[in-house]
């Protein structure tokens, strides 16, 4: 009621005055209330999160998260991490920093047990011909997911697996995952279509620590910086001498 009867008419009056001042043909600016939220975090232009209580005039029984430009709603983030980032944001909105520390620690343990298919980055693969190199598999400056795709295709040929696994083609939807340095292929990444071929024998070389950092902690970093929180307890002099 306050928005409809007080705030919106005042804003419309100001817009009319602005249109008149700037000699506009007509005032085309219209403001309507979108949400009422009790908490919000803005980290950059068009990147924010709100704890919504009222959505376009509908009072919600339980608060709802509204996310804009956040990794939790981006398809380039693994699904399991998107869900957990949303959980973490709910903790940030309604609980204490120690509760976030527990969520991160618990998810880290779970993450380390997940298969490659659950924690890999989804991407679209383009420009395979552009970055292919007959002598070195790929050229310098190749995007990491394309690099992984070219390594995958090379190994499929080398191991004679063409009849079992399709080669990655231009425009295919793929996943890529980081590998530890000491792996049989000698490259730090591998891409694949739906399942990482067991014949590659790379499961023990998946770099879970890097994947956790890149898929979960890094997307959370700008949110935590905005509220001055950390993702794990920090050692302090007070605690050391206490």
Regions picked out by a protein language model, each given a short descriptive name:
Residues 1-242:
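DNA-dependent DNA polymerase catalytic subunits
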């Amino acid at each position: 009621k306050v928005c409809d009867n007080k705030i919106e008419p005042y804003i419309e009056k100001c817009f009319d005055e602005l249109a008149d001042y700037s000699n506009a043909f007509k005032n085309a600016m219209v403001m309507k209330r979108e949400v009422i939220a009790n908490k919000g975090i803005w980290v950059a232009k068009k990147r924010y999160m709100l704890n919504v209580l009222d959505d376009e005039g509908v009072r919600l029984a339980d608060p709802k998260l509204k996310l804009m430009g956040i990794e939790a709603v981006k398809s380039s983030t693994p699904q399991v991490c998107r869900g957990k980032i949303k959980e973490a944001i709910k903790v940030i909105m309604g609980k204490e920093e120690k509760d976030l520390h527990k969520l991160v620690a618990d998810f880290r343990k779970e993450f380390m047990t997940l298969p490659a298919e659950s924690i890999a980055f989804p991407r679209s693969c383009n420009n395979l011909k552009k970055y292919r190199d007959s002598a070195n598999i790929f050229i310098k400056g190749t995007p990491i997911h394309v690099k992984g795709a070219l390594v995958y295709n090379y190994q499929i040929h080398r191991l004679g697996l063409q009849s079992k696994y399709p080669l990655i083609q231009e425009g295919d939807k793929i996943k890529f995952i980081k590998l530890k340095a000491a792996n049989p292929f000698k490259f730090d990444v591998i891409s694949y279509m739906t399942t990482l071929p067991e014949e590659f024998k790379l499961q023990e070389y998946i770099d879970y620590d890097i994947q956790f950092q890149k898929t979960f902690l890094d997307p959370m970093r700008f949110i935590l910086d905005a509220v001055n929180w950390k993702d794990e307890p920090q050692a302090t002099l007070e605690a050391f001498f206490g």
